[in-house]
Amino acid sequence: MSFVWSAAVWVIAVAAVVISKWLYRWSNPKCNGKLPPGSMGLPIIGETCDFFEPHGLYEISPFVKKRMLKYGPLFRTNIFGSNTVVLTEPDIIFEVFRQENKSFVFSYPEAFVKPFGKENVFLKHGNIHKHVKQISLQHLGSEALKKKMIGEIDRVTYEHLRSKANQGSFDAKEAVESVIMAHLTPKIISNLKPETQATLVDNIMALGSEWFQSPLKLTTLISIYKVFIARRYALQVIKDVFTRRKASREMCGDFLDTMVEEGEKEDVIFNEESAINLIFAILVVAKESTSSVTSLAIKFLAENHKALAELKREHAAILQNRNGKGAGVSWEEYRHQMTFTNMVINETLRMANMAPIMYRKAVNDVEIKGYTIPAGWIVAVIPPAVHFNDAIYENPLEFNPWRWEGKELRSGSKTFMVFGGGVRQCVGAEFARLQISIFIHHLVTTYDFSLAQESEFIRAPLPYFPKGLPIKISQSL
C-alpha cells in the first residue's frame, strides 16, 4: 500500500512540474528580445472571453481600455487562439502599415483562417491582392459608379423611400439593405430569375454581425447556426448560376462575367470556389457596412438639429441649381456639391468604427518602441482607440461634422482609418459614400423624419442596432 501511495505522490509531483512549466511557457512565450507588457490569459482560450465584453456607441472596448491604462499603447495578449500584440497609437500603427508586405502581411488569427482555408483569395497579399482589388474596382470604382450605377442607385433609393412614406415606422437599416440589394445584385449577377434573386437576397439579408459575439452566449450559438445555414444557401445559389453561365458562354457585362473569364486564364488566380466566395463577400459587406453607417448617420442627424439644418440647406441648393425638375442626383452634384454631406459621412464613419480591429502578421521579428514582436505573431490594430483619442480629436465622443471643415474628406490617414489602413484600403469606399449621399439627399429634400423610438447601438465588438433603428417619414410640406 505504501508503494501505491508513493507512486501516486510521484505521479502527482511530476504532473505538477509539467503543468507548471506549461503554464509558465504559456504566460511567457519565447522571444528573441523584449516582449511588450501584457497577459496571455488562460491557457488555450487566452483572453478571448474578455475581448467580447459588450459596450456602447461612445466607448472604446473595455478590453482595450483597461489594458491601455495598465500596459500602455501596445500590449500582448492571446485572443482567438493566437499570440497577439495590440496597437492603439497612431505612430506605431503607421509604422506597421509602412512595413506592409515587408515585415508585416495581411492575415487573420488562425481560428478565422481554418474555416475558410489558407488558400482563400481574401487572405492573399502582394500581387494577388492587387489583382483582386483591380478587378473589383472595374465594377465598384469611381468610373463604374459614374457610368453604370449612379442612375440606378438614385432611382431605387427614391422609389423605396416613396413606398415607405406615411406608412408608420420602419427599420432604417433594413430599408437601406433592401435598396442596396435591389440595385447591386443585378450588377454583380444579372439576368437572374425573380425567384432565384429573391432566394439569394433573402439569404444575404439574413447575414448580419450579431453572430460575432461571446461564444458563451446561447443567442450567439443560435445566430451562428442561422448564419451558417443562410451562407450555405446563398453560396449554393451563386454556384449554380456560375456553373450555368460558364457552360452557356453567355456574356452579360456583370461581375460574374469577369469571374468566369478569370477562371479561364492560364495563370489562374480565381478558381471556382474563390470566385463564388468573392461574389458572396461583396454582396454581404456592401449590404451590412453601408446600411449600418447610413442608419447611424440618420440617428445622429435626428438628434442634431443644427447639422440637419445645414444638410438641408446644402441639398436645397442642389435642387435649386439642378437642370430638369425630375432629374436625379448627378455625378457632378455628388462629387462637387455635397461638401457638408461628406463631412457628416466622415464624422459618422469616425464614430461608427465599423472595423473595430484590423489584423496583420509579423513575418520576421520586428522591433518597435523598444519591444520585439516575434515572427508569426498577429498584430491587432484598434482604430477606435485612435478615433476616440482626445489628443487627436477635440471632444471625440461628440458628433461634430464641422471638425472636418477645410480638411481632405476622401482619403484616409494615420488618424482616420475608417476604410482600412496601409495598402489594403476598402475597394467599396466610393460605393459606400455614394449610396449614403444619395439616401441622405432624398431623405432630407423630400421628407420630414424622426426616430420612432430610442434605439441602442451596441458594440460586441462589431457594432449593430439590437432592435434596429425604427424611423418615421412623411412628405415635407
Curated annotation (Swiss-Prot):
SUPFAM superfamilies (UniProt xref): Cytochrome P450
Obligatory cofactor(s): heme
Keywords, ordered alphabetically: Heme, Iron, Membrane, Metal-binding, Monooxygenase, Oxidoreductase, Transmembrane, Transmembrane helix
Domain of life: Eukaryota
Listed GO CC annotations: membrane
Deletion phenotype: Increased levels of thalianol in roots.
EC number: 1.14.-.-
Record carries keyword Oxidoreductase: yes
InterPro entries: Cyt_P450, Cyt_P450_CS, Cyt_P450_E_grp-IV, Cyt_P450_sf
Localisation per UniProt entry: Membrane
PROSITE patterns: CYTOCHROME_P450
Transmembrane segments: 3-23
Enzyme category, top tier: oxidoreductase
Residues binding heme, per UniProt: 426
Disulfide bonds listed in the record: none
Tissue spec. comment: Expressed primarily in the root epidermis.
GO molecular function: heme binding; iron ion binding; monooxygenase activity; oxidoreductase activity, acting on paired donors, with incorporation or reduction of molecular oxygen
Membrane topology: Single-pass membrane protein
Role this protein plays: Hydroxylates thalianol into thalian-diol.
Sequence similarity: Belongs to the cytochrome P450 family.
More info: Constitutes with three contiguous genes an operon-like gene cluster that is involved in the thalianol pathway.
Protein name: Cytochrome P450 708A2
Organism: Arabidopsis thaliana
